[in-house]
Amino acid sequence: MGAQWKAKGKAQAADARGKLFGRLAKDIMVAARGGADPASNSRLRLVVEQARKVSMPKDTLERAIKKGAGLTGEAVHFEHVMYEGFAPHQVPVMVECLTDNVKRTAPEMRVLFRKGHLGASGSVAWDFDHVGMIEAEPVVAGSDPEVAAIEAGAEDFEPGHEEGTTLFLTAPTDLDLVSRALPAQGFTVISAKLGYKPKNPIDPASLDPAHLEEVEAFLAAIDANDDVQNVFVGLAG
């Protein structure tokens, strides 16, 4: 968990994959505001590469780029909103949303946080570092992530969310630079985004199993909301 929370289990993973395309389409539309050409728009390039890695249909990807760049004549406006607070049992949470209607999203978040606590802006942000997060896998077995991190300019690294992957951590401004440098160090980039890493993560083993289940259920409910892009949680592991 440690940084970005992800659904577990086959059914949840399949459902999460379906949601992933919708979330990536939003990210693409927002990034495309800066131009429809990934070659000259690094933010768009990163999310397009991620979309291709997860096999987003080409027509869906291209439609999102055109829509975001204003080439279809459709008005597209998504607002980036962060919600901060605590899951049950005082586990800090940061929820990143892209919404076309904050007046809809805000009350939905208040309802979802009833089993925890919705805080004011900055209430838990102090306990997270804003970082670049690059998940990558070795091209060949035995590639050294420490050497790759040093040579590519990453600040740190740790095991990734998926088995066999590495999560490279960067300064926010170095995200694109490091993601471009990693392939030369023997790592294929799976995803690259800005996110929040907890400074003082709670060990899940320190929670009663029933309490941990309550935390997981809370996070799953938050993640299921259509306006939620990412959920960052202060749990280790």
Curated annotation (Swiss-Prot):
Keywords assigned: Cytoplasm, DNA-binding, Transcription, Transcription regulation
Any Pfam family matching the protein: Transcrip_reg
Highest taxon above the source species: Bacteria
BP term (GO), one: regulation of DNA-templated transcription
GO molecular function, one term: DNA binding
Subcellular location: Cytoplasm
This protein's record includes keyword Iron: no
An example Gene Ontology CC term for this record: cytoplasm
Location (main, coarse): cytoplasm
Keyword Iron: no
NCBIfam families registered for this protein in UniProt: PRK12378.1
Family, per entry: Belongs to the TACO1 family.
Protein name per Swiss-Prot or TrEMBL: Probable transcriptional regulatory protein Bpro_2928
